[in-house]
Amino acid sequence: MPLLDIRNLTIEFKTSEGWVKAVDRVSMTLSEGEIRGLVGESGSGKSLIAKAICGVAKDNWRVTADRMRFDDIDLLRLSSRERRKLVGHNVSMIFQEPQSCLDPSERVGRQLMQNIPAWTYKGRWWQRLGWRKRRAIELLHRVGIKDHKDAMRSFPYELTDGECQKVMIAIALANQPRLLIADEPTNSMEPTTQAQIFRLLTRLNQNSNTTILLISHDLQMLSQWADKINVLYCGQTVETAPSKDLVTMPHHPYTQALIRAIPDFGSAMPHKSRLNTLPGAIPLLEQLPIGCRLGPRCPYAQRECIITPRLTGAKNHLYACHFPLNMERE
């Protein structure tokens, strides 16, 4: 039984010109202990999917789905109070730019202690304060912060971006989640710090069997850490496959374009040579093309592309394209 099962998730925004689809019929199934990657350009709907899973929706949103089940519990049939309790006990989310998520006027130790849920405590009520402090120290050690005294006394601006992100991960782990959503957790960080954060998340997955949903725009990075990757373009899933298969045998032109856009530092490039990019720009949500949304930019587009392609293929490798690539190699 999957931990999270989503079928045909659609998210719409209400604007002055009517309803606009930001996410269109996205499906996803996450198993217990899996690391799933969600990759796409800015505006492809990655963060919206994460917020829909957590139940964080604004008043001008309309979220619909054929199925949205967490541990075989239908999230769509729960009241807001019941869903908040279920998500609060089982799901945590790590946001990008950790320093903007922490209170700059409060010491890190106090913020961490305040975010430890009371329901995780099993002892006497008068021992709760001492337990919170010990639990906060344990969480800091767990995420790789050895000098807990200095970290707990510090304000967020006194820590580096990597240390702040480790504190955010410690806060996310305080409720012992079964699903951890990391929304670009290493954005604008140095490569060494990025590797530390991803090694930490992988270790948490291996030791605690925590399911992790990694959201990023960096396909090369996701392919190193995720078991399976979903590729999004303009709010639609264009390809889903295990990481190794996706990188070595992409079937969708957009996935191929993402792979070709990764710079190759192993070979010299001619002077003033162009990088591999798709022509044109991402269409506006109010002016989406007919049929395949990549059609106007796709080098392989043909007349049939005015018909919207459906996700097809084998069970482990799905693609939404009328003229898939690399089919002769299978």
Curated annotation (Swiss-Prot):
Q: Does the keyword Protein biosynthesis apply?
A: no
Q: What happens when the gene is disrupted?
A: Loss of resistance to protamine.
Pfam entry (one): oligo_HPY
Instruction: Specify the protein's topology with respect to the membrane.
Output: Peripheral membrane protein
Q: Name the PROSITE patterns for this protein.
A: ABC_TRANSPORTER_2 (PS50893)
Query: Which parts of the sequence belong to the ABC transporter domain?
Result: 6-259
UniProt keyword terms in alphabetical order: ATP-binding, Cell inner membrane, Cell membrane, Membrane, Nucleotide-binding, Peptide transport, Protein transport, Transport
Quote the subcellular location field of this record. Answer: Cell inner membrane
Q: Which residues cross the membrane?
A: none
Alphabetical GO biological process terms: peptide transport; protein transport
Annotated Gene Ontology cellular component terms? plasma membrane
Q: Does the keyword Acetylation apply?
A: no
Any one GO molecular-function label of the UniProt entry: ATP binding
Relate the induction remark in this record: Part of the sapA-sapB-sapC-sapD-sapF operon, RNA detected in mid-log phase cells.
**Residues annotated for ATP binding in this entry:** G40, E41, S42, G43, S44, G45, K46, S47
Free-text function comment from the UniProt entry: Involved in a peptide intake transport system that plays a role in the resistance to antimicrobial peptides.
Protein family: Belongs to the ABC transporter superfamily.
Its protein name is Peptide transport system ATP-binding protein SapD
Organism of origin: Salmonella typhimurium (strain LT2 / SGSC1412 / ATCC 700720)
Gene name on record? sapD
